[in-house]
Curated annotation (Swiss-Prot):
GO MF annotations in UniProt: actin binding; actin filament binding; calcium channel inhibitor activity; calcium-dependent protein binding; protein domain specific binding; protein kinase binding; troponin C binding; troponin T binding
Gene giving rise to this polypeptide: Tnni3
Keyword set includes Ion transport: no
PANTHER family for this protein: TROPONIN I, TROPONIN I, CARDIAC MUSCLE
InterPro entries, per database record: Troponin, Troponin-I_N, Troponin_I, Troponin_sf
PTM notes: Phosphorylated at Ser-23 and Ser-24 by PRKD1; phosphorylation reduces myofilament calcium sensitivity. Phosphorylated preferentially at Thr-32. Phosphorylation by STK4/MST1 alters its binding affinity to TNNC1 (cardiac Tn-C) and TNNT2 (cardiac Tn-T). Phosphorylated at Ser-43 and Ser-45 by PRKCE; phosphorylation increases myocardium contractile dysfunction.
Protein's recorded name: Troponin I, cardiac muscle
Family recorded in the similarity comment: Belongs to the troponin I family.
GO cellular component term of the entry, any: cardiac Troponin complex
Organism the protein comes from: Rattus norvegicus
Function: Troponin I is the inhibitory subunit of troponin, the thin filament regulatory complex which confers calcium-sensitivity to striated muscle actomyosin ATPase activity.
Amino acid sequence: MADESSDAAGEPQPAPAPVRRRSSANYRAYATEPHAKKKSKISASRKLQLKTLMLQIAKQEMEREAEERRGEKGRVLSTRCQPLVLDGLGFEELQDLCRQLHARVDKVDEERYDVEAKVTKNITEIADLTQKIYDLRGKFKRPTLRRVRISADAMMQALLGTRAKESLDLRAHLKQVKKEDIEKENREVGDWRKNIDALSGMEGRKKKFEG
């Protein structure tokens, strides 16, 4: 027994089998082949029941919030607008009460105006900050442009201002040439052979050849 154990210990252990990896084709085939769809743990009827329950809870919450707002509004109105006691009041007392009510209305209007001014200011600041953010990001908001028909003269007038007339008057910058000068140039060009003969001294020889 001891010899067998010693022989087993002396022999080299066999190498483990190499792990076979799937090729790209195998992975592609595995991805494209149909697999059994996993069944959902919740049935369709159970899902419908849960959705209905969630909608009912949301509806109850909205109704509760609306009731709380109505109650809060009633409490505020009861504290600020107390019922008037007009029994046993004389003419002068009624006038004093009307003056007090008018003064309270004026005060409320002033407060409302101040609140509206603050809201308008905040809206303007928010719009300015939003535009600055767009500018920093490089996203410029395009303004709404209207199509306007305009002539070329009006466009040049708008672009150049007082220089529009000067730029449009192109003939003023051209050199004026008289008709007499043009005829003179044509006459000189037409007699170029005579001029060449006179300059070259060939007029006598030409007569000999012609004779």
